[in-house]
Every structure is written in C-alpha cells, then in structure tokens.
Amino acid sequence: MALQLLPSTLSVPKKGSSMGAAAVKDTAAFLGVSSKAKKASLAVRTQVATAPSSVTTSPGSATAKPSGKKTLRQGVVVITGASSGLGLAAAKALAETGKWHVVMACRDFLKASKAAKAAGMADGSYTVMHLDLASLDSVRQFVDAFRRAEMPLDVLVCNAAIYRPTARTPTFTADGHEMSVGVNHLGHFLLARLLMEDLQKSDYPSRRMVIVGSITGNSNTLAGNVPPKASLGDLRGLAGGLSGASGSAMIDGDESFDGAKAYKDSKVCNMLTMQEFHRRYHEETGITFSSLYPGCIATTGLFREHIPLFRTLFPPFQKFVTKGFVSEAESGKRLAQVVAEPSLTKSGVYWSWNKDSASFENQLSQEASDPEKARKVWELSEKLVGLA
C-alpha cells in the first residue's frame, strides 16, 4: 500500500470558499502503514551501491562507489495539484525513476490516491497529503503536517491551478480573495515562503523551486496576445485584496470581472514571483528557482469549465494546425526534467521546448519580467497572506 497522509478529522470549508472540498483540521495520521514502512518512506534515504564506480551520475543518485559505501539519498519532491494532468504525469515520471519520493499535495486526497494507483505508481514511491490552496489555513496546516512527517524537502513544484474562462462573476477563497489569483498565486506564494526554510535545510546537492507558468500570460507570444490579454496595471486590485466587495476582484482594478484574464494575470504573478525568489535567495542559498511552459496540453482537465465546443475543437486544432499539442505524458516528462536534469540548474530561467522537444531558455514579456513590478507583487502578496 502506498504511504498516505490522511486527515483524521474533517471540517466544512469556511463560507466563501467555492472549491467544494472538505478542509482538513490540524491533526493528521498515517493510516494502514506499518512503522517499518513509515520509517523506510520518511527517513532520509541512503542506498548501498554494489555496481562498479563507472556508473554515470544522474539526478537523485550519485556515481556508484564500492560495495558497502553510501550513495546520495533519494530526493523528495512536493508537487501541488498532482491528482491529474501535468502534476500527475510529472509525479509518475519522477517516481518511476526510483530516485524520487513524490509528495502529492492535493485538495482531494482520495482522488489523488486513486489517480496514483491508476497511473501505476509503485507503493512506497509517493505520499498523498491534503492541501487546499483556496485556504491559507490549509496551506499552513500542510506545512505543519509535512514537518511532522520528518521528510526533507529537496524540490517544491507549484503546479496546481484553476481556470474559469467563461466566468463573468468572481468566486472567492476562504480568505476572501478572488479564486483564480487566490489559488494560483497567493496560496502558492504562502506555501513557497513557508517551505523556503525546509529547502534551505536540505542537504540535497540540487535544491529547486519550480513554478509552472503559462504562454497565455506571456504577451510577447502569439498565444499571449489572444484577448483578453494579461495586464496587471498598477496593481490597485491586488492592493485592495481582490475582495470585490470594497474594490475590484481583478488585479488591475477593473470593475468588470473576466475569468480568463484573471487566470492569465495569476500566471504573470507566478512568473514574477519566481524571478523575485531568484533575486532574493539564489545567491545566498544556491537554490535554483525556475518557471516553465511545458507546451499546450489541450486535453487537460484545466479546460473543464470551458464551453463544450471549445473542448471538442481545441485538441485537434493544436495537433493539426498549430502543431503545438503536447500529451500529458510528454508534459510530465518536461516538468520532471526541470525538477531533476543536471542541465537545467540555471536559476531565474523560464523554460520552454521546441518542436523537437529540446528545452531552451524562453524570453518573458516586459511586464512578466519587470523587477519593480515583481517587488510590488511580492510585498502586496506578503500582506495578503499574513507575512507582513
């Protein structure tokens, strides 16, 4: 049985949260796992090498040494939104190497557990933990539960996202923030800030934080110029808390709500946040901070709230017209590369892939790479999540 961190008590989400999932209270318990299995899965792992010393080094394992000497331990990666789509595909790709233990941080832990089994992920290669990014309390509870599990943290992947392209009225998180920005940006911002302490404590040689971006938030691309275009404006909506009641639910302060733009704006925040982490922490800590666009995953559940005609026509359009279609499996491999490949350790980079599936450093738009705007987004976000 795969190791799972399941909540021992449930509570109803705060009024205002439209995510529809039960929130987990502070306590959590391991269920159905022997103490021996827990120790094997949670301890800082070492592997005894018996192969000749000529074995090539790869992420999560070191060059093999003579028998009886220890090699680099297995890496631990936390992936948010790992119950489906890109997150699940990346979790599977990393777990299959045997070099990574994957913590699947998901709102619906039962769905995540079933998805891992359906994907064929081996027992003991993953841990399912509850995380609802629409609740800042849940984010803090996740961090507490993760630390109680006494696992190291070597890589954090901020992947989870919601997309409400047809919405014309906002919904709000448990903390009263517009849902798309609240989940995609603010929840991840708090998670990443809190877990920086754990990343800094890790003895893993290639510690990383990866924040998934999107081409739709990058206005120097064709896709980024499809209306409505991402634009954060002067951030007056973010400064007002995105509550909608006393101000705008849009980051730029626009009084009319547009779900598609809210998503795109949240991805600009993701890419700005990655760069600000790089500026503030990389030189001091050596941690690699990066973002990526893995390609157009036209069949992903991210589009489930789009109109039926779009869901029908978009995949073949991407496959046969733009040639930009990427399967979930391929996108997962690309995200796994950013997590583990030695060639992708450069910090502050936004990774993309060409049609030959070769990675390259992509250029971000002026807004998505504006250091002053990144600083302002950081400082406003600190206030909204209670860190300032």
Curated annotation (Swiss-Prot):
Keywords assigned: Chlorophyll biosynthesis, Chloroplast, NADP, Oxidoreductase, Photosynthesis, Plastid, Transit peptide
Entry keyword Cell division: no
Presequence positions on this chain: 1-74
Biological processes annotated in GO: chlorophyll biosynthetic process; photosynthesis
One cellular-component annotation, GO: chloroplast
CDD domains for this protein: LPOR_like_SDR_c_like
Main subcellular location: plastid
Domain of life: Eukaryota
Catalysed reactions listed for this entry: chlorophyllide a + NADP(+) = protochlorophyllide a + NADPH + H(+)
InterPro entries per record: NAD(P)-bd_dom_sf, Prochl_reduct, SDR_fam
Enzyme class, UniProt record, top EC level: oxidoreductase
Record-level Gene Ontology MF annotations: protochlorophyllide reductase activity
Key word Plastid present: yes
Pfam family, one: adh_short
Annotated metabolic or biological route of this protein: Porphyrin-containing compound metabolism; chlorophyll biosynthesis
Subcellular location: Plastid, Chloroplast
Protein family membership: Belongs to the short-chain dehydrogenases/reductases (SDR) family. POR subfamily.
Known role: Phototransformation of protochlorophyllide (Pchlide) to chlorophyllide (Chlide).
Official protein name in the record: Protochlorophyllide reductase A, chloroplastic
Organism annotation: Triticum aestivum (Wheat)
Organism taxonomic ancestry: Eukaryota, Viridiplantae, Streptophyta, Embryophyta, Tracheophyta
